[in-house]
Amino acid sequence: MSNDTMYFNSSRRLPTHSRNNSPIVAAKNNSSTRIPALNNKKPSKKTEKDIEQLLSPQQLPNGQRPDFGHGPRGGKQTNGAKTKNKKKQDKELQETKDSYDNLTKNLKNLLINPEKTEKTVVETLIKSNSNSATATPQKAPNTTQGITNSHGLSQNFSSPLSTPMILPHNLPMNPLGNPNFPANNHYLPYNPQQLQQQQQQQNRLPVGPGPMNFDNFRPGIAPVAPPQPPPGYPPGPNGPPPGMPQQLNFNGQPMYYNQPPMPVPNSAFPINQSIGASPTLPRIIPPNPMNYINPALSTPPVVKNPTSNGPVTNTKPTNKSKRNSGRKSNTFAGASFATDVPNESNLPKPSFT
């Protein structure tokens, strides 16, 4: 049998041990007394080194050993460990619930009793926001600073971080900021006598031209006229309601509805004040820009057709009809007909370019 036939048929033969391997197999299967020389053979240092390299413990980049879920770290926990973890979780949940309950209680008390002092409110908030339930409240730092304004009066301004957002009870409710009227002027009832007195005071203003007195003039402050009711509201000293938007003139002063702007005395020329003080002139109500509709934009232009009886709407051709009417194709599959003059754009392009 040739070598080729032996190698070709080697896969079909039954696996049998060769003669050279039979003593080693017998030595492994039998006792060590049969061949004592094989048992006394020691492994080389190279083999031990290779085994140590293969069995080196695995380590993650963060220095921890990998946990595949079947090791001692990821195995089943004992009953004692489970009980300990459950108690710890229950304690954390109870502390969180107590802190939320305390915070809700403090907020309710703050809304019911707004007369609480700043110190008490800050202490309760700090105590509720602390991590541990037994944390001692810290005293709020005093951030109040005294600032002296240009009139020589000292005012106390406190930091918004340590003060609650509570409006004082004596805050003036005048939305226009006019010092000539009481603070809560929009709560007063309608008084026709007071309105008549105000109109008489307006009529007493000088009508004719004349020099103005600049002794008590302050630069940057324009004379403020009493508020006039907007259209649709009954006349009264209340002025526009507090929810109406307030417009400002070029000097930064509030500008009332239906009231012409008062000029600022910035020159020595006489100023005629009869426009705003004359009771005989009718009041001009400005038109509402929301109700104004341009008729030219609302309806399309109409052209009279002499041949027909009714008007015809002037319509423009659409883009599709314009494209179809302006383009006539004289070519078919890239080639022009014999009756037309061939153009360079209509000729077929070669494929090798």
Swiss-Prot record:
Localization: Cytoplasm
GO cellular component: cytoplasm
InterPro entries: PNRC-like_rgn
Region (Disordered) location: 1-100, 129-156, 169-189, 218-253, 296-353
GO molecular function per UniProt: RNA binding
Keyword tags: Cytoplasm, mRNA processing, Nonsense-mediated mRNA decay, RNA-binding
Pfam families: PNRC (PF15365)
Biological process per Gene Ontology, one example term: mRNA processing
Regions of compositional bias (Basic and acidic residues) in chain numbering: 89-100
Bias type Polar residues, positions: 1-34, 305-318, 342-353
Feature: compositional bias, Pro residues: 224-244
Family affiliation: Belongs to the EDC family.
Function: mRNA-binding protein which stimulates mRNA decapping.
Name used for this protein in its record: Enhancer of mRNA-decapping protein 1
Species whose genome carries this gene: Candida glabrata (strain ATCC 2001 / BCRC 20586 / JCM 3761 / NBRC 0622 / NRRL Y-65 / CBS 138)
Lineage, broadest ranks: Eukaryota, Fungi, Dikarya, Ascomycota, Saccharomycotina
